[in-house]
Amino acid sequence: MAIQHRDPRGGGGSRDARTNRRIKAREVRVIGAEGEQLGVLPIDQALARAQELGMDLVEVSPMAKPPVCKIMDYGRFKYLEKKKQNEAKKKQVVVQLKEVKLRPRTEEHDYDTKIKKVRAFLGEANKARITVMFRGREMSHRELGQKVLQRVIEDLRDVAVIESAPRMEGRQMFMILAPNPKMLQSQRDKAKAAAAAAPAAAPAAGAPAPAPAPAAPAPAPTAADPAAQR
């Protein structure tokens, strides 16, 4: 393999590091494949070192004097970096904001149903916007909306904390609740405990069942045994 024919970037964008023949410096400080310092070398000699190992010469610090280059398998390096980024994205938690609308005089059954939904939503590590809608003359009784929101706070105290205190916006009074950190930690602890206590995995579908243990042989009859005498 000749190094001049390898370009792991495949003509990629400017974000990628310069590699191999794309490195413009006449001499570079070289770091070996195992992290060892190889000193300052002419670019041709540095490329030859990388070629001997079947690897790439990658410019990792272009602004240094002279630029710093590392011998590595650049294609594999980029693959692992992409894999790490994908795994990090999978671990990111997307927090949603769910709005629940109430009235100053919401019926009890409707209130209970909506509170259950908010409780479940907070339990999934999401946030909730609780909005009290005013109509007509209800605007002159804003204290009723405050009472409704205060009741919500009390009913969800074990699973929620106030992120945004109640305030008016037009004909609406609203607040934003976030999951209670203690509740989320308790859920994580329970999940870990359940995973630790889980029984051993069952045999895969279609796998043969384990053979039954052989039965113990019957004891040999003795001289005193009537069956032996017969």
Curated annotation (Swiss-Prot):
One of its GO terms (cellular component) is membrane. GO terms for biological process: ribosome disassembly. Keywords: Cytoplasm, Initiation factor, Protein biosynthesis. GO terms for molecular function: ribosome binding; translation initiation factor activity. Residues 209-220 have a biased composition (Pro residues). Residues 1-21, 184-230 are annotated as: Disordered. InterPro entries: T_IF-3_C_sf (IPR036788), T_IF-3_N_sf (IPR036787), Translation_initiation_fac_3 (IPR001288), Translation_initiation_fac_3_C (IPR019815), Translation_initiation_fac_3_N (IPR019814). Coiled coil: none annotated. It is found in: Cytoplasm. Residues 193-208, 221-230 have a biased composition (Low complexity). Its main location: cytoplasm. The keyword Protein biosynthesis applies. NCBIfam families: infC (TIGR00168). IF-3 binds to the 30S ribosomal subunit and shifts the equilibrium between 70S ribosomes and their 50S and 30S subunits in favor of the free subunits, thus enhancing the availability of 30S subunits on which protein synthesis initiation begins. Monomer. Belongs to the IF-3 family. This is Translation initiation factor IF-3. The gene is infC.
